[in-house]
Amino acid sequence: MKDKNIILPVQPYLLLDAENYHEILTGRMGISNFYEFHVQDGVPGTFMAVPDGSTALVFGIGERDVKVFIGGTVLRLKEWKFEEGRYYFGVRFLPGKSILPDGLSIQDVVNTDLEIDRNEYGQHLTDSLAEAAGIRERAEILCHYLEGNRKSRIKDTLSKLEEYMRKRIYATSGSITIQMLSRETGYSECYIRRVFRQIHGISPKEFERFIRFQALLNRIGENAGKGGSQEAALSCGYYDQSHMMKDFRMFAGTTPEKYRKLISRKAEQINCDEREVDSYGIGEN
């Protein structure tokens, strides 16, 4: 069952700039969304990535091979480069829910993208994805492989503590203090920082900043063309307008008002098939 407090991570510049972009929003199995787009030959495949606290697994399907990449959250606005002449299919995990290959820690992928062996997530996975008919079939195939990996994981004390902290951060729009989390859990501030960083690769304070920013992106996106970004910012955990503007410029590279106009123009052009909510239960038994 989907947690109503979960904020699905948004990468707006893919939606705005990528060719033939399509995504399926889900929130199931620790997955935020599946997405696809093309980078044609001779076309620069560079987009801007924003902080989202999540991890993305991307398959670049070419005529001769399939390349696999995994990347964690960026720490501020950063270029995200893709090889031209490939179709890309990706899955974005919810924060704290990423499934990493053996031998790779979350710290290894924060603020970077790593190319990994094509068989890291299972034999024949990339071949099956390359031969699939479309994004929904690819999502079903990938879920099958990921589910086998996830079932082997046991929820221990550390993951339960992290889950509690993450849910409290969501519920308070990123405004709960580390001191309050320490009092609520009974663990020291130093210990809960260490546990959180072990699972997310970033500190609770950084994660809270990203959650406030992502909540604001979602609010602006839901109200594209209607204004009210300042009011939305206050409801997303920011102390004041100055606080909001500083983070937004650092993370989005623009102002909330200019971003709202970009989203508004896209909303006027967007094909309803570009973005859909998973109503078919991808990955559910």
What are these regions (language model features)?
Residues Q198-I202, D247-Y259:
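A secondary-structure capping/hinge motif
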